[in-house]
Amino acid sequence: MARAKGVRILVTLECTECRSNGERLGGGVSRYATKKNRRNTPNRLELNKFCPYCKKHVLHREIK
C-alpha cells in the first residue's frame, strides 16, 4: 500500500526587494527554508524576515 504524503512540506521564502533590484552591488538574493502545514495555509506563505543583503526586515514570499 502506498504511503500518504505528509501534511507538512518544505518551502523556500525569497526576498521581494532583492528580486526586484537585480542589479544590487551586494549581488545576492536572500532565501530561507521553512516548513508549512498544507491544511492550515493552502495559499502561498508571506513572512517578514531579515535580509542580509538589504540589511533590514522585508517581506519574503514563498517560491516554487
Curated annotation (Swiss-Prot):
GO BP annotations, alphabetical order: translation
Pfam families named among the record's database cross-references: Ribosomal_L33
InterPro entries per UniProt: Ribosomal_bL33, Ribosomal_bL33_CS, Ribosomal_bL33_sf, Ribosomal_zn-bd
Database matches in PROSITE patterns: RIBOSOMAL_L33 (PS00582)
Protein's cellular compartments: Plastid, Cyanelle
Protein name (database record): Large ribosomal subunit protein bL33c
Family note: Belongs to the bacterial ribosomal protein bL33 family.
Gene: rpl33
GO terms, molecular function: structural constituent of ribosome
Main location: plastid
Signal peptide: none
